[in-house]
């Protein structure tokens, strides 16, 4: 039976206005829209009055918006029937954890009530199309129609393909019907194999074969034999990549054989809790570094949010599934798309060339895709610290004559680093009889055919198959699985995981055969043991769907009880679906129909299918020299600063958490003005050391339109000039991931790919001492469509993205582009040796040209000398600032340095050649360094010792003030106000934020950038930062116990425990499941801290589901009430813990006036480094800190203080319960965005009780308790940041 419960309004006023504006633009006479959430409860038994009231209370969440009786025509948007939304899974979990077992499932829809003039059927279809994503959602016209969401269908049996009766044609038909993308020789192979077995294949077997052998999974092109211009080539592409490892195997522990590569890390204290006691402690051991970079291009073109989200999610799983289990740590992301053409902000180089119907626009991709990728990382709890963004779309004269080149099929790059224990780097042995386990969520009818679909050019497959290959994301489920993996690796030798893979393309049909065959075993499986939410799925759908957030593992039979205990505690679902066999055979039994859908020798599935040969021709690019008439430097500057590749990326940065883990030493945002220009990302290896890891990206794809090999060399060179800015030491410590994107089969591209791989694998990397132990290829980068009567195609440039990873010696010595105005000199190190080539530059692109000669690595020895010289200068502390030269050339390098330093530039380019345009806009490799004037000679001498004497040019100095001036021989070449340039550079991000977020907030942030008087972040402390007020209490040897409380989806508990640990506490890991099952109580604890993250993925209101699981459970409710009423206890709630505790007002004495915390005014997750002041309040944690003003990490989507009315706010203020407020850089309490990131009244961001024993705050002190984890800090801070004081105050209060 289904029950319908009304919810709160679903759209804020500005969202409704945006929708109305879209309807107006489409000439649809819609005058009003009202939208509210509707909840549907599928019940297995009726609820009594109390239970009904409880369910209603559970479904009351979010900001208090006025709802009203709806008018107009109803359009109900719900998830597609036959799928279960992530919202539903989490909301149902909450209902069950609150004791409502009668609820089978909760689902949510949005009811839109449309008031409009007379609309035709076609117009109603347009309205409907605007209101839902057809890939994920459906539209009903009555609330009762939602019954279809809970319809259950009968299981369907396996079907077979009549090969023996109909011969080869049966396979050809099945290939088309199932979208298998099989090649002719593969059809021959299958015909032969099944004829020998003497039986017809089942659809599931063919599907499984297609997935396992798709280009996506098998990398046929990279393993192919090559004939170029009639000549047989000696090596495959993959062999040339492997050559880098054969030449330089140094520091690599695992390459080419696992889900990620592993290199040596540093010996540090890894901090985690003991399995038996729950007590956190440091464990001194090597933290080896794993690295992985994936692409998720096809799904992102079809449905950008889930496409990018599951791209990040899949890459995170790859990291977790390395060796015998590992820990993902920090991420990077990248996008290449066609031109944005932002409405009202179209740029002179952006022409509309059309696109296929079924893929979305570049603007849609860049609006939704980055949000999806960021949301997954945020909710999983992984900081996203690095990225790139390129737009390109043009008709150019390239290798194949004049044609359209661009990224209608986008690149969505997702990568990252993690850590792994030394004894878990290699996979274990799978013994016969080992249990084969699926860890993670249930099977669902989604993502069918992702592997085969992404191996086709976009526009070739059937639109319905495209629908089927879109996946959905549930990061909070993946977090639970990762917690299980963490518990396993933390057990060291007792780790129950023998072997682990993630489930990706092809679902279990790919993952399980890979798991057993990699372990040298076969497997026998039972189909009906697989967790499934949809009983009507066919065997093919159950076995082959790509439901996300799943891993496959082999666990020794005797370890299963331990594994079961770990999963139950973390509430991570799992199923034992089979066991490993001696015989290398794969069998899948279906007990419902008592038949065998799969019964195959493993070698038929994974055997040597025919090897591909690529027989290709070389084409030479024509390229026309840059036509320069009409190009002035002033116009070029403005255009280039508007090119998205060059322009400010804030809209891509602040949506992603950059502080979670407490181990981020360098994020994108640099300096007191938080400008996104960092050269590389840096994390600390642990919470107790200065060792670390760095990552950086290099890519220069447009150059491939002129010279394939140069483009590949530049990508390596740029990654190197980016990562050089931190203290790494020997270049052999740097390892690269190479991600290759190409339109295989397009004239000239295959030979070009071979040339590019050879340039990097056989020549450049071996010469530099660099290794490529990991990478990926995507070989179908082309879209085709019909535009009127014309066939069109858009082909991407050959695109190599290089991600560089390295161990860092000391994270404190990372140099940023932030200029200083002390007596200084700016030096350009020009690795282009004066070539100043303008082909395929940002300058060429903004004038709709390609040019003829591009930049290149001019001298490999000098590139190596450059890296070594910068490392020497970093180690000698001789660099004040550093920024590499890249897109936009020297002009952009200097401008970005000036933006970060909020200063002027007085530059002189006389020595850079007579062609001023080329001197300023060429994109040859190199960097600008800033040194003290007194050190200039010494620095030039170090550069000369490394063979760079002829590359070094003095180009002027940074000066205080607002003028950005470039001269040559006394003549002014260019002069502008730095503020004006800063505003031009910011206009793209402003326009994107206006479109995507609350436009008022976007306007406020943009306006703040034009204030030259802004002093930037600054610190005023009312206490001595170096005084340890806890020292006398720590000296007693007594360590009070603090319960570090987490719920499923919480992700900030480890750094919280570390902060309390440093202050003299015994930090104990307490999961809500421990309290609900009675394994642990709160009576032994002196302090309690509720940590940040996304409990239940913020479903049913941030922190509200967590709070209700306490309030609606009598025993746990009493446990908390007793704790809060016990004198001599302290409690802290941070972020999600703050939201949760604000909902426990009825249990916490003195908290009656606390507000609620709801959706930010920007309607967006905000990750900022914000200035707050400590106000006079009873809070015991903030004693002795009143009047201090200091920055703190902020990361939340629902942090806005909501009070009932003005009287409530006045009472909260007059009682003195406000503990922290946001202030602007002038020290004034603010409600202006983004200094106040969530729009809270009076800047309120922390409150306390009347006794001061319980304090709750939205910002994250635990993520910045170490100086090194602050995005910016004054030079004179030592190891401890000022926020360490609150943890020491806690220790002092407990005596």
Curated annotation (Swiss-Prot):
The active site is at residues 1135, 1260, 1262. ATP binds at residues 307-318, 678, 886. PROSITE patterns: GATASE_TYPE_1. Residues 1042-1295 form the Glutamine amidotransferase type-1 domain. Mg(2+) binds at residues 718, 722, 884. GO terms for biological process: 'de novo' IMP biosynthetic process; glutamine metabolic process; purine nucleotide biosynthetic process. Disulfide bonds: none annotated. Residues 305-327 are annotated as: Disordered. Gene3D superfamilies: 3.40.50.880, Phosphoribosylformylglycinamidine synthase, linker domain, PurM-like C-terminal domain, PurM-like, N-terminal domain. Pfam families: AIRS_C (PF02769), FGAR-AT_linker (PF18072), FGAR-AT_N (PF18076), FGAR-AT_PurM_N-like (PF22689), GATase_5 (PF13507). InterPro entries: Class_I_gatase-like, FGAR-AT_N, FGAR-AT_PurM_N-like, PurL_large, PurL_linker, PurM-like_C_dom, PurM-like_C_sf, PurM-like_N_sf. Optimum pH is 7.2 with only 50% of this activity retains at pH 6.2 or 8.0. GO terms for molecular function: ATP binding; ATP hydrolysis activity; metal ion binding; phosphoribosylformylglycinamidine synthase activity. One of its GO terms (cellular component) is cytoplasm. It catalyses: N(2)-formyl-N(1)-(5-phospho-beta-D-ribosyl)glycinamide + L-glutamine + ATP + H2O = 2-formamido-N(1)-(5-O-phospho-beta-D-ribosyl)acetamidine + L-glutamate + ADP + phosphate + H(+). It is found in: Cytoplasm. Signal peptide: none annotated. The keyword NAD does not apply. Both N-terminus methionine truncation and retention have been observed for this protein. Its EC number is 6.3.5.3. Keywords: ATP-binding, Cytoplasm, Glutamine amidotransferase, Ligase, Magnesium, Metal-binding, Nucleotide-binding, Purine biosynthesis. Pathway: Purine metabolism; IMP biosynthesis via de novo pathway; 5-amino-1-(5-phospho-D-ribosyl)imidazole from N(2)-formyl-N(1)-(5-phospho-D-ribosyl)glycinamide: step 1/2. Phosphoribosylformylglycinamidine synthase involved in the purines biosynthetic pathway. Catalyzes the ATP-dependent conversion of formylglycinamide ribonucleotide (FGAR) and glutamine to yield formylglycinamidine ribonucleotide (FGAM) and glutamate. In the N-terminal section; belongs to the FGAMS family. Monomer. This is Phosphoribosylformylglycinamidine synthase.
């Amino acid at each position: 039976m289904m029950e319908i419960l009304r919810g709160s309004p679903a759209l804020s006023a500005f969202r409704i206005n945006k929708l109305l504006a879209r309807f107006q633009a489409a000439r649809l006479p819609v005058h009003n829209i009202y939208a509210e959430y509707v909840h549907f409860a599928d019940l297995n038994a009726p609820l009594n009055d109390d239970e009904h009231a409880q369910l209603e209370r559970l479904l009351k969440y979010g900001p208090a918006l006025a709802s009203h009786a709806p008018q107009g025509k109803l359009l109900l948007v719900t998830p597609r029937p036959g799928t279960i939304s992530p919202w539903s899974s989490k909301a149902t979990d909450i209902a069950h954890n609150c004791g409502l077992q009668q609820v089978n499932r909760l689902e949510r829809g949005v009811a839109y009530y449309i008031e409009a003039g007379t609309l035709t059927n076609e117009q109603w279809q347009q309205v409907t199309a605007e209101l839902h994503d057809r890939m994920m959602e459906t539209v009903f016209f009555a609330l009762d129609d939602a019954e279809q969401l809970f319809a259950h269908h009968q299981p369907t049996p396996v079907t077979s393909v009549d090969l023996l009766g109909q011969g080869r044609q049966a396979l050809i038909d099945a290939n088309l019907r199932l979208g298998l993308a099989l090649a002719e020789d593969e059809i021959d192979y299958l015909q032969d194999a099944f004829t020998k077995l003497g039986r017809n294949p089942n659809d599931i077997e063919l599907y499984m074969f297609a997935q396992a052998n798709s280009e996506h999974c098998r990398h046929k092109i990279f393993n192919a034999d090559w004939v170029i211009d009639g000549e047989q080539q000696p090596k495959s592409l993959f062999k040339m990549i492997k050559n880098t490892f054969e030449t330089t195997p140094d520091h690599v522990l695992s390459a080419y054989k696992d889900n990620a590569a592993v290199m040596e890390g540093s010996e540090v204290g890894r901090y985690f809790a003991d399995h038996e006691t729950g007590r956190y402690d440091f464990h001194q051991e090597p933290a080896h570094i794993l690295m992985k970079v994936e692409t998720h291009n096809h799904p992102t073109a079809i449905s950008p949010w889930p496409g990018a989200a599951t791209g990040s999610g899949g890459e995170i799983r790859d990291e977790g599934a390395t060796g015998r289990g590992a820990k993902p740590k920090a991420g990077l992301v990248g996008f290449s798309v066609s031109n944005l053409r932002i409405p009202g902000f179209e740029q002179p180089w952006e022409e509309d060339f059309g696109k296929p119907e079924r893929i979305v626009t570049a603007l849609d991709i860049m609006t939704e895709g980055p949000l999806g990728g960021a949301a997954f990382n945020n909710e999983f709890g992984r900081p996203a610290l690095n990225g790139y963004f390129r737009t390109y779309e043009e008709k150019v004269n390239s290798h194949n004559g004049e044609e359209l080149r661009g990224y209608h099929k986008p690149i969505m790059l997702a990568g990252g680093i993690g850590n792994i224990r030394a004894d878990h780097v290699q996979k274990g042995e799978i013994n016969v009889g080992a249990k084969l386990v699926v860890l993670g969520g249930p099977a669902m009818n989604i993502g069918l055919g992702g592997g085969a679909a992404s191996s086709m050019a976009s526009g070739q497959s059937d639109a319905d198959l495209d629908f089927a290959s879109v996946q959905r994301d549930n990061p909070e489920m993946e977090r639970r699985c990762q917690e299980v993996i963490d518990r396993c690796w933390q057990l060291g030798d007792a780790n129950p995981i023998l072997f682990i893979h993630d489930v990706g393309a092809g679902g279990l049909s790919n993952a399980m055969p890979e798991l057993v065959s990699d372990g040298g075993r076969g497997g026998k499986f039972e189909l009906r043991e697989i967790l499934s939410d949809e009983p009507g799925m066919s065997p093919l759908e159950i076995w082959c769907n790509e439901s996300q957030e799943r891993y496959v593992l082999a666990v020794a039979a005797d370890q299963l009880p331990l594994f079961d205990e770990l999963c139950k505690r973390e509430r991570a679902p799992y199923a034992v679906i089979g066991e490993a066999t001696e015989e290398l055979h794969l069998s899948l039994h279906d007990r419902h129909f008592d038949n065998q859908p799969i019964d195959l020798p493993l070698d038929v599935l994974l055997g040597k299918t025919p090897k591909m040969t690529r027989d290709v021709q070389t084409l030479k690019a024509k390229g026309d020299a840059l036509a320069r008439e009409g190009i002035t430097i002033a116009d070029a500057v403005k255009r280039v600063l508007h090119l998205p590749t060059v322009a400010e990326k804030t809209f891509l940065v602040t949506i992603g958490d950059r502080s979670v883990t407490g181990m981020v030493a360098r994020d994108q945002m640099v300096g007191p003005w938080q400008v996104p220009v960092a050269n590389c990302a840096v994390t600390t290896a642990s919470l107790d050391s200065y060792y670390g890891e760095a990552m950086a990206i290099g890519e220069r794809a447009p150059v491939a339109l002129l010279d394939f090999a140069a483009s590949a060399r530049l990508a390596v060179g740029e990654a190197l000039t980016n990562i050089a800015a931190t203290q790494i030491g020997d270049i052999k410590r740097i390892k690269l991931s190479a991600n290759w994107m190409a339109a295989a089969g397009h004239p000239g591209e295959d030979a070009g790919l071979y040339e590019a791989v050879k340039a990097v694998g056989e020549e450049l990397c071996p010469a530099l001492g660099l290794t490529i132990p990991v990478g990926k290829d995507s070989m179908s980068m082309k879209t085709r469509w019909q535009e009127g009567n014309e066939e069109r195609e858009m082909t991407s440039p050959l695109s190599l993205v290089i991600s560089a990873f390295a161990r860092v010696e000391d994270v404190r010595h990372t140099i940023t582009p932030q200029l200083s105005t002390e007596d200084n000199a700016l030096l350009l190190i020009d690795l282009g040796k004066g070539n100043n080539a303008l082909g395929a530059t940002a300058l060429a692109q903004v004038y709709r040209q390609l040019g003829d000669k591009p930049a290149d690595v001019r001298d490999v020895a000098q590139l190596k000398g450059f890296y070594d010289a910068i490392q020497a200068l970093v180690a000698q502390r001789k660099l004040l600032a550093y920024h590499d030269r890249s897109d936009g050339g020297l002009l952009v390098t200097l401008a970005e340095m000036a933006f970060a330093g909020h200063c002027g530039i007085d530059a002189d380019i006389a020595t850079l050649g007579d062609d001023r345009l080329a001197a300023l806009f060429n994109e040859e490799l190199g960097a600008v360094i800033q040194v003290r004037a007194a050190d200039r000679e010494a620095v030039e001498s170090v550069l000369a010792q490394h063979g760079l004497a002829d590359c070094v040019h003095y180009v002027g100095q940074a000066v205080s003030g607002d003028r950005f001036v470039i001269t040559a021989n006394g003549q002014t070449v260019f002069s502008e106000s730095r503020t004006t340039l800063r505003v031009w550079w910011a206009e793209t991000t402003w326009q994107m934020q206006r479109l995507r977020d609350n436009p008022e907030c976007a306007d406020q942030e943009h306006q703040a950038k034009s204030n030259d008087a802004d002093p930037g972040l600054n610190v005023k402390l009312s206490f001595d930062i170096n005084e340890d007020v806890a020292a006398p209490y720590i000296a007693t040897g007594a360590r009070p116990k603090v319960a570090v409380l987490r719920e499923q989806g919480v992700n900030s508990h480890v750094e919280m425990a570390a902060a309390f640990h440093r202050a003299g506490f015994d930090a104990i890991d307490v999961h809500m499941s421990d309290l609900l099952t009675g394994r642990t109580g709160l009576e032994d604890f002196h302090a309690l801290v509720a940590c940040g993250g996304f409990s239940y993925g913020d479903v049913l209101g941030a922190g509200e589901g967590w709070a209700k699981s306490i309030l609606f459970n009598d025993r746990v409710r009493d446990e908390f009430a007793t704790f809060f009423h016990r004198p001599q206890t302290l409690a802290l709630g941070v972020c999600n813990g703050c939201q949760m505790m604000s909902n426990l007002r009825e249990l916490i004495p003195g908290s009656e006036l606390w507000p609620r915390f709801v959706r930010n005014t920007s309607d967006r997750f905000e990750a900022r480094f914000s200035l707050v002041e400590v106000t006079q309040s009873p809070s015991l944690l903030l004693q002795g800190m009143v009047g201090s003003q200091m920055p703190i990490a902020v990361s939340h989507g629902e942090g806005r203080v909501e009070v009932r009315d003005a009287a409530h706010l006045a009472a909260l203020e007059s009682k003195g319960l406000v503990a922290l407020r946001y202030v602007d850089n002038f020290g004034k309490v603010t409600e202006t965005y983004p200094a106040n990131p969530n729009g809270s009244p009076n800047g309120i961001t922390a409150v306390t009780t009347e006794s001061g024993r319980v304090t709750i705050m939205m910002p994250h002190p635990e993520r910045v308790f170490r100086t090194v984890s602050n995005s910016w800090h004054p030079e004179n801070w030592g190891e401890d940041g000022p926020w360490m004081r609150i943890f020491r105050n806690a220790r002092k209060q407990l005596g």
